């Protein structure tokens, strides 16, 4: 019911049903009704997984509880693998270098129980390729396409695999075919838009030989797919932010600004991953399109300080460094620019370097309490 209410747009009722499931779990501890518990945990987990991105970690926990009771359940094993696959970008910080993430192990386990699940095969292929296990990944892709070639979920992951490996034409072909079978998939529309965006960027990078006509062509195709994605799923904030940047490229700054303000207003609580991505893109809007360095710094800094090691964090750090270094090239005594470099170094874990930057910043602005406070904290950490 939670799932149905969510898709009917009745979010309050959807949340209410989720809470009722949790209440059932409290009333039915592990020692009672053993045959019911795994099903209840499983239903709760699938509901969380289908609600929104901000519930994925709860889905992981519910699937884990279901599997503690019924370890060989095919659906719970598959669901746990999918949930891990979707949440891993938030939880990989503690992995050793070259250590495989939990999703790879769980996808293998799920496929042992259901070896012909083409969706799981295609998901595992995407994940293995990210860890340079190309031979096994390609073998799984072939199996998935042979087992269930018309499944749009298979097509979208195969398309993602090709896009990640810069095989854009193959990815576009796969996603366009998937879209014919699943016209209302906001995810596939978004994936297709990302491919078109790569095409646009590739054409732009051919300067001075790039064709503005080609750039406009790919931009318009990208905009069309993103507009479809957000029409189908109005809560698709990341697609909205990508769309806003494209509107800005077309110099529709007012519409872009409206979209970013709406994204920030409607951001789900505790969704740090999405928040980081929105602030990075909003920073790009101010930096590249509005030429508003001060506002760009505000949003890049917000993205930087969110404690997730994602691509967007690296972009925020890189842009802040670029801004600070440019200012220092004009004025070596710019205390704010030095403090900005200190903030970036600190966020990246380079405490000694951060302390040095803040110390230099204080030499330029001796009464700045913010720099002094940061320097004191860093020195305490270092000793």
Positions of the model-derived regions?
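Structural motif corresponding to the intra-repeat A-B loop/turn of tetratricopeptide repeats
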Residues: 8, 51-53, 87, 131, ...
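"A position-specific structural signal for the A-helix of alpha-solenoid helical repeats
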Residues: 1, 7, 36-39, 43, ...
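Conserved structural position within tetratricopeptide repeats
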Residues: 23, 65-68, 109-112, 143-146, ...
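TPR alpha-solenoid repeat register
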Residues: 76, 120, 154, 188, ...
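Flexible helix-coil transition and linker loops at the boundaries of alpha-helical arrays
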Residues: 24-37, 76, 108-114, 227-231, ...
